[in-house]
UniProtKB/Swiss-Prot annotation:
InterPro entries: Mycoplasma_lipoprotein_cen_dom (IPR004984). Disulfide bonds: none annotated. It comes from Mycoplasma pneumoniae (strain ATCC 29342 / M129 / Subtype 1). Belongs to the MG185/MG260 family. It comes from the Bacteria. Pfam families: Lipoprotein_X. Residues 165-183, 213-233 have a biased composition (Polar residues). This is Uncharacterized protein MPN_146. Residues 162-183, 196-239 are annotated as: Disordered.
Length: 265
């Protein structure tokens, strides 16, 4: 994204003879970016401005905050000319009339699919190319182990005889979900169970602390906190208070086979 200057409603930046690129990248990505700019600066035309990195702390959120601050105080001396961030920062520039279209830049090497986000930027009245993709973000999938355990364990078909404890977990519904027995799924299911056990143990310890501080002390059953199965059950019981009873429905987990591969993308 580029910042402009000079027009009505905007402010002029001091011409310091260089292009400042704001970046919040760290680690290897920061090193690679600097190497690319070093190569550009060594090969650029004599009269072209060199590019210099302005480091911003706080990742992309820090970049957004820094941009808003510099615009609000009309920073003319240390403000940057470009920023590596998401497209919503173009809207921020647009509110101060500081957006700059890349009309003279050759973007023919970019797929239109990667540039189409420019048509969906709020606050920008004039259509144009205001930002170009320079890197890929990493998609991260985070699994809440204890919650997933409650859902799957409630939906799971019980092995062998149904004990009173298992019956209470199924909330009156006989589960039909099965866990696939391939190695990857088995290992994942063990991790999910361990997450539930850890959560259950933490919950029981907190319950004990609360009970000691309470005037109406509730006697906990001895030994229940020391069983790993009890810990997982305690976790399920607490999560059930927020999520409610599991209900088996068509199109849901009824007859479903849980596999670790479902999380692959």
């Amino acid at each position: 994204m580029l910042a402009s200057c000079g027009a009505k409603g905007r402010f002029d930046q001091v011409d310091d003879g260089k292009i400042k690129l704001a970046s919040s990248l760290t680690g290897k990505r920061d090193v690679i970016l600097q190497e690319v700019l070093n190569k550009y600066n060594s090969r650029k035309a004599k009269d072209d401005y060199p590019i210099e990195i302005t480091k911003i702390a706080g990742s992309y959120d820090g970049g957004r905050s820094d941009l808003q601050t510099r615009l609000s105080v009309k920073d003319k001396t240390t403000f940057y000319n470009m920023i590596l961030n998401y497209s919503d920062t173009i809207s921020t520039l647009g509110r101060s009339n500081m957006e700059l279209p890349l009309d003279s830049v050759d973007v023919s090497q970019f797929s239109e699919n990667f540039l189409s986000f420019n048509d969906r930027i709020s606050g920008i009245s004039r259509k144009g190319i205001y930002g170009i993709p320079v890197s890929m973000s990493t998609d991260i999938l985070v699994i809440n182990g204890p919650v997933l355990h409650y859902i799957l364990n409630s939906a799971k078909k019980k092995d062998g005889a149904v004990t009173k404890k298992n019956a209470s977990n199924s909330n009156g519904n006989e589960g039909t979900l099965t866990v696939n027995n391939d190695q990857q799924t088995t290992e994942l299911w063990k991790k999910i169970e361990e997450a539930a056990k850890t959560n259950g143990k933490t919950t029981q310890e907190q319950t004990k602390r609360d009970a000691k501080q309470s005037t109406s002390l509730i006697q906990l059953k001895e030994g229940s906190a020391n069983t790993t199965e009890g810990n997982a059950s305690e976790s399920d019981k607490e999560i059930k208070k927020s999520w409610g009873n599991y209900q088996e429905v068509d199109g849901g987990l009824k007859g479903y086979t849980f596999k670790a591969s479902v999380f692959e993308n």
